[in-house]
Amino acid sequence: VIMINYLMGFLSNFFNPAVSFVAITDHKSVINKLSRIYRFAKIINSSVDKYSYIGINTWVVDTHIGAFCSIASEVYIGLATHTIDNLSTSPIFTERKNATGHSWVECDHAINRLQTEIGNDVWIGFRAMICGGVTIGNGAIIAAGAVVTKDVPPYAIVGGVPARIIRFRYSQDIICLLYTSPSPRDGATS
């Protein structure tokens, strides 16, 4: 079944000039034709809006990516979690098909897959990691190597492990103005 999903994703994006021939997408992912997905990127159960690009060998899982986003190479977005309220965190106890190749259950137990949201005009640096369920606000910048475990406000610049706010790109007055003015993201023209 997994192979069929990837094959369907490959075929659905075969004629999409936005997706590299050697990128991997599944049939649930929606890639805007005005975006770019570079080689060896893996896009699973996600959407990528117009004028955004995803760098080489980047993984995107269970994520919506807004317009005008710049995502560097080797970034991981929507990192999976393990159950932590069971006796063990091993997927042997929750999934029939898992990374170990072994299972002690006859049916899969529900695992809460968290949707990750990346706003518009977000820049994510090389080898950053974004945990599942995080929301990154419009205009935010994620520094290279950062590990984002919590929501990031609009126009914040974050970095570190775990990521923390370094500063904001603009004053709060300008950020408010940006939210009340029409922008190219909304289809406005000058």
Language-model segments: which ranges?
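Solvent-exposed, charged amphipathic helical/linker segments at domain boundaries
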Residues: 166-176
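Conserved catalytic segment of ABC-fold P-loop ATPases
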Residues: 153-155
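Basic (Lys/Arg-enriched) interaction patch that binds polyanionic ligands
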Residues: 133-135, 139-151
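Conserved small/polar residues in nucleotide/adenosyl-binding loops
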Residues: 179-188
